[in-house]
UniProtKB/Swiss-Prot annotation:
<dbReference type="InterPro" id="IPR018209">
    <property type="entry name" value="Pyrv_Knase_AS"/>
</dbReference>
<keyword id="KW-0067">ATP-binding</keyword>
<keyword id="KW-0418">Kinase</keyword>
<dbReference type="GO" id="GO:0004743">
    <property type="term" value="F:pyruvate kinase activity"/>
</dbReference>
<dbReference type="Pfam" id="PF02887">
    <property type="entry name" value="PK_C"/>
</dbReference>
<protein>
    <recommendedName>
        <fullName>Pyruvate kinase</fullName>
        <ecNumber>2.7.1.40</ecNumber>
    </recommendedName>
</protein>
<feature type="binding site">
    <location>
        <position position="289"/>
    </location>
    <ligand>
        <name>substrate</name>
    </ligand>
</feature>
<comment type="subunit">
    <text>Homotetramer.</text>
</comment>
<feature type="binding site">
    <location>
        <position position="321"/>
    </location>
    <ligand>
        <name>substrate</name>
    </ligand>
</feature>
<dbReference type="GO" id="GO:0005524">
    <property type="term" value="F:ATP binding"/>
</dbReference>
<feature type="binding site">
    <location>
        <begin position="74"/>
        <end position="77"/>
    </location>
    <ligand>
        <name>ATP</name>
    </ligand>
</feature>
<keyword id="KW-0630">Potassium</keyword>
<dbReference type="InterPro" id="IPR001697">
    <property type="entry name" value="Pyr_Knase"/>
</dbReference>
<keyword id="KW-0597">Phosphoprotein</keyword>
<keyword id="KW-0324">Glycolysis</keyword>
<feature type="modified residue" description="Phosphoserine">
    <location>
        <position position="45"/>
    </location>
</feature>
<dbReference type="InterPro" id="IPR011037">
    <property type="entry name" value="Pyrv_Knase-like_insert_dom_sf"/>
</dbReference>
Amino acid sequence: MSQISRTQSIMATTAQEHLETGGRINWLASLNTAFTPARNFRRTSIICTIGPKTNSVEALNKLRDAGLNVARMNFSHGSYEYHQSVIDNVRASVAAHPGRPVAIALDTKGPEIRTGNTAGDVDIPISAGTVMNFTTDEKYATACDTQNMYVDYKNITKVIQPGRVIYVDDGVLAFDVLSIKDDQTVEVRARNNGFISSRKGVNLPNTDVDLPALSEKDKADLRFGVKNNVDMVFASFIRRAQDIKDIRDVLGPEGKQIQIIAKIENRQGLNNFAEILEETDGVMVARGDLGIEIPAAEVFAAQKKMIAMCNIAGKPVICATQMLESMIKNPRPTRAEISDVGNAVTDGADCVMLSGETAKGNYPAESIHEMHEASLKAENTIPYVSHFEEMCTLVKRPVSTVESCAMAAVRASLDLGAGGIIVLSTSGDSARLLSKYRPVCPIFMVTRNPTTSRFSHLYRGVYPFLYPEQKPDFDTVNWQEDVDKRIKWAVTRAIELKTLTAGDTVVVVQGWKGGMGNTNTLRIVRADPDHLGIGQME
């Protein structure tokens, strides 16, 4: 049986098919739309928000079986006791059924602008054409009415201008700014009918606001995350690179391994995206608030631009918000929602995210299943060789030794029709760079670091394997012997999981000695349970 035919039984498409088909258009024209990809090889990770419907070990087991990779906690809601229970339940689920690691993400509330409390805490009716005031006068903080609506952003009169728009309650109500009456009052006119309740969110599109990156609540939440060893922080309403630095300062040395993912949710963040990308560990295209702050039609282009910039930088990117929203109530998604997931995958997103679908929806496991299926199909449409060639032309030279090895490993995997790439990693950086070049085959990352094994779910195509044996004393154990032992273990495990077929060619990426930053060696071995060929070139 040929190498190509063996690999074809495992992978959606083979390297040889990619090489022979040519350009992107010809590749797409030759797609077999009825092809069923291997169910155990999904490159894109799935992030799920954990809520009351799913916060139990039993429910989490079902989500993991359906395809959960990262469990998200939304700190806009819930007490510390509740979030502690989520963390405990996720870890209990993993302990009971080890399998692949599950990462835990803390999503911050972030700096927000909100209205005050209405008088008597009753909904205030608003009619189109109504002229009223938005004010920072504290006497209206608990007594909002149809004439004066309190907002808790003291500098609103300094940053807003006549002709701008103010949105309330996620854009349900829109107000045109007529004038700045004094240093506390903005005069507005309602565009549409509706109601305002207490403490509703306020958006100021196309306006640079000077809110701090972190509220006192956010700082306390981050300290809670450090204490509980969360794997990543989804940082809300990031506007500038300094915001990321401020978060790192709060996380401190104890939280240095926590990955910071910048949520881009406003025009300011979009305008400053290049500097934010340089500072952050990854990005979330948070389309909910972004779709209020900028025209909805522009979000489509912004998504593609940000994902492409992340791909070029080799940093993970998440696409989020309302991806399968209808499944909160319905057992099946709309065709438009499936297309939205597929579009995010083909754009180049490393992860896709579910919010209300798994936090409060009636069909949480089914939502993950649908996202899993949509991602698999979409991944099969990507011309990986074309992507690799373009990435090689875009990389800034000279590159690091580690990145040079990653490029060479992906090239070798394509030329050999390899069934997989095995990378031995401590920090996860080698796996991240391999993911950047999008090989056709899976990337099996072997690490002794539990945190690295979890946050590597951020990288597309990376399968984290947590090696169970402790690091030996290399004064008494030969370094290469330990390397060979880890490679054999990874090959055996990948075959057991049916993500690798016995006899496949495997590209191995390793270091010449222990520690981070020493990756500089490629080896070619054969996956054979009886004779893996370790220790010799084949």
